[in-house]
């Protein structure tokens, strides 16, 4: 690039002229353009459409740098584009996250996750919202199971565990597909699971109530699957029920019930 050659030393790259007369004005112009475009686009389109638009624009800028610009320009240009396309609209994106969760918009969730992961602290509000969403989903599932009467004495252990596992499996898949198993989302998910399994409409204020129902279900599985040929399948089922998502000491609990079937009246 001729703008970057030092006339006194052709082998030495000097970018002062390039930066002053091209790079800086180019980045300023790009920021101005995207500031106006993003505001107009959001005024006329949905947030989910904007996620696609921002994704496309960032990809185009990456391609432009690779094709036509000095590699030193990349970080400066992309960071400014991320600021104007994502950071400037982060509040709106965060505020739309819950509706995407409620409607199971997996692709849009992944797109929002990917975009917000590009800015500092962009994911933390999403993690908090996801944790609250998982807890509410499980609490609602158990409340529906118990019904309006609120009688927990006759609660079927299998139905209780199935309700927990259904919520767990659904949101576990969301963590791994939409959020790519990101550690912060995994931590939020684990925290939500530990809280809802110990505090819900079936347990009241006693976490022992939940472990008792799960123990009854484990005992039912043991009695139903007593054949040696089914031992591996049984251990898999029990391991899923008492996974570390639910119990910090699940390995010890699992070995205990496998070694000595519970006698639960």
Regions found by a protein language model. Name each.
Residues 1-265:
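Eukaryotic scaffold/interaction segments
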